[in-house]
């Protein structure tokens, strides 16, 4: 499933979008997702906390036994935030930990993201 955000949105809108994404994924048995957030140059701590603490655990439960695999396509500015902001880095390190019951990887190249999601097309 490919989801692209073309602008910033309030947390409530993003939460509704994620709920819709999860509903579509459940209905169609989709556990490999590409999230394109290249047009965003910032992310709120509130959103990072919500996806980490609420959404990923919920998605993991609802998609089981399939494993959620999410390639996140970032802008260079957003990648810099993830690396330089200690609060954001905490959330990023948590979700990238291979011990989690889901797989998330960050990319700045869409081709690389698709190859990670679908190695058979690589």
Q: Where do the language-model regions lie?
A:
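Amphipathic, Lys/Arg-enriched alpha-helical "gate/interface" segment within cytosolic domains
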Residues: 1-122
């Amino acid at each position: 499933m490919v989801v692209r955000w073309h602008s910033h949105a309030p947390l409530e809108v993003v939460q509704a979008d994620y709920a819709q994404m999860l509903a579509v994924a459940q209905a169609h048995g989709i556990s490999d997702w590409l999230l394109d957030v290249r047009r965003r140059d910032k992310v709120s701590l509130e959103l990072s906390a919500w996806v980490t603490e609420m959404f990923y655990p919920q998605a993991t439960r609802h998609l089981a036994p399939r494993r959620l695999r999410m390639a996140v396509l970032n802008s260079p500015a957003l990648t810099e935030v993830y690396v330089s902001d200690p609060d954001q880095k905490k959330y990023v390190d948590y979700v990238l930990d291979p011990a989690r019951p889901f797989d998330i990887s960050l990319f700045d190249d869409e081709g690389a993201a698709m190859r990670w999601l679908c190695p058979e097309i690589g």
